[in-house]
UniProtKB/Swiss-Prot annotation:
Homotetramer. CDD domains: ASS (cd01999). This is Argininosuccinate synthase. It comes from Bradyrhizobium sp. (strain BTAi1 / ATCC BAA-1182). The keyword Lipid biosynthesis does not apply. The keyword Transcription regulation does not apply. InterPro entries: Arg_succ_synth_type2_subfam (IPR023437), Arginosuc_syn_C (IPR048268), Arginosuc_syn_N (IPR048267), Arginosuc_synth (IPR001518), Arginosuc_synth_CS (IPR018223), Arginosuc_synth_type_1_subfam (IPR023434), AS_cat/multimer_dom_body (IPR024074), AS_multimer_C_tail (IPR024073). It catalyses: L-citrulline + L-aspartate + ATP = 2-(N(omega)-L-arginino)succinate + AMP + diphosphate + H(+). Its EC number is 6.3.4.5. It comes from the Bacteria. ATP binds at A17, F18, S19, G20, G21, L22, D23, T24, S25, A43, G129, T131, D136, D194. Keywords: Amino-acid biosynthesis, Arginine biosynthesis, ATP-binding, Cytoplasm, Ligase, Nucleotide-binding.
Length: 445
């Protein structure tokens, strides 16, 4: 069954994810004039650069929407963000700086909650502003059809008639002006920005060039810590978790997770914490580049992983990291609610996050520069007396115990020595000149 419509379905209800910007404003008016019954849906994701959400539905009505709804997605977004922290669902990193998958998390929430709202209104055709080269077109496609199996997709930016008539920002602005709307294009930035309560993404235009870096970005969730005139003072922060849930910051307990995240963003943002520059593979395997902000996610992630390493054993931590890499990629691909992702999430939340209770004290400085000052938890398995260099009573083990443990190592040491001898005899390994160390041999071909 065809789910993607190449032309505008005239006379039918069409839902559009409406941001109030130039693109969706022009698209809504154009679809209305061409005969579609337009329904506008706006997701309140707590975007830090959006000042008046209530104005957006009113604007949609003025452009010809039969109905316009504002859907509050903030609580669900924070819920998914915390789940990502609990399961370590982050697969993109460079030099220790992590991208916290904030855009994929936002798409998972938007794609399900807006389509659910459309379904309530009997709207089974959905349009949004994603382009065919990006990740979002596939993410929204998957989440939309998961939520409404009868959904059909109409995207103005895949409709050749729309492209021919309104193919650029100048054409769209002129179209709105010609129809009596005093729409002035905002000044062109050197890059594009997309944001939600969890984080911000800066990409495209000048940022497609790798010789343009973070210094051309004007942060919307933090401070430009790289500038000499940007004053950033060290700050001590205490983060508390209970059974994997962040519950308190600097002694203030939060019952509303959205309020907690807003405060975490404010704290981390004062230092530029969580900003990073990444080259990544899009879903279609072509590489793209983005500069990201996520001050609250970064703060909570640091504290969570500090408790994690003090509470769980090595094998559990290793499995958490392996599963997190896989889960992060599934999230990025728009598969956050697929069964394989739910399995990995539930495993981490049940067996890892449930034990994460305690407080972490940090000193934040500039950017991602911080120090861990204290870690407290009733569940810590870190017990310094076990390995103390001082003489202790009731030692966990004795010199004789260690002799026995080392003697058992002779079994695998003997096996390894035998293998190295075999590799040397076949020429795979050669002894390095002047040293008793093995090196890989050259191809004998």
């Amino acid at each position: 069954m065809t789910t993607i419509l190449k032309g505008l379905p005239k006379g039918e209800k069409v839902g559009i994810a409406f941001s109030g910007g130039l693109d969706t404003s022009a698209a809504l008016l154009w679809m209305k004039q061409k005969g579609a019954r337009c329904f506008a849906y706006t997701a309140n994701l707590g975007q830090p650069d959006e000042s008046d959400y209530d104005e957006i539905p009113r604007k949609a009505m003025s452009f010809g929407a039969e109905k316009a709804r504002l859907v509050d997605c903030r609580t669900q977004l924070v819920h998914e963000g915390i789940a990502a922290i609990q399961s370590g669902a982050f697969h993109i990193s460079t030099g220790g700086a992590t991208y916290f998958n904030t855009t994929p998390l936002g798409r998972a929430v938007t794609g399900t909650m807006l389509v659910a709202a459309m379904k309530e209104d009997g709207v089974n055709i959905w349009g949004d502003g994603s382009t065919y080269k990006g990740n979002d077109i596939e993410r929204f496609y998957r989440y939309g059809l998961l939520t409404n199996p009868n959904l059909k997709i109409y995207k103005p930016w895949l409709d050749q008639q729309f492209i021919d008539e309104l193919g650029g920002r100048a054409e769209m602005s002129a179209f709105l002006t010609a129809n009596g709307f005093d729409y002035k294009m905002s000044a062109e930035k050197a890059y594009s920005t997309d944001s939600n309560l969890l984080g911000a993404t800066h990409e495209a235009k000048d940022l497609e060039n790798l010789n343009s870096g973070i210094r051309i970005v004007n942060p919307i969730m933090g401070v430009p810590f790289w500038r000499e005139d940007c004053v950033v003072k060290p700050e001590t922060v205490v983060v508390r978790f209970e059974e994997g849930q962040p519950v308190a910051l600097n002694g203030q307990t939060f019952t509303d997770p959205v309020a907690l995240f807003l405060e975490a963003n404010a704290i981390g943002g004062r230092h530029g914490l969580g900003m990073c520059d990444q080259i990544e593979n899009r879903i279609i395997e072509a590489k793209s580049r983005g500069i990201y902000e996520a001050p609250g996610m970064a703060l909570l992630h640091i504290a969570y992983e500090r408790l994690l390493t003090g509470i769980h054993n090595e094998d559990t931590i290793e499995q958490y990291r392996i599963n997190g890499l896989r889960l992060g990629r599934l999230l990025y691909q728009g598969r956050w609610f697929d069964s394989q992702a739910l399995m990995l999430r539930e495993t981490a939340q049940r067996w890892v996050a449930s034990a994460i209770t305690g407080e972490v004290t940090l000193e934040l400085r500039r950017g991602n520069d911080y120090s861990l000052l204290n870690t407290e938890s009733p569940n810590l398995t870190y017990q310094p007396e076990r390995l103390s260099m001082e003489k202790v009573e009731d030692a966990a083990f004795t010199p004789a115990d260690r002799i026995g443990q080392l003697t058992m190592r002779n079994l695998d040491i003997t096996d390894t020595r035998t293998k190295l001898k075999l590799y040397s005899e076949t020429g795979l390994l050669t002894g390095s000149e002047g040293a008793q160390i093995f090196q890989l041999g050259h191809d004998k071909g």
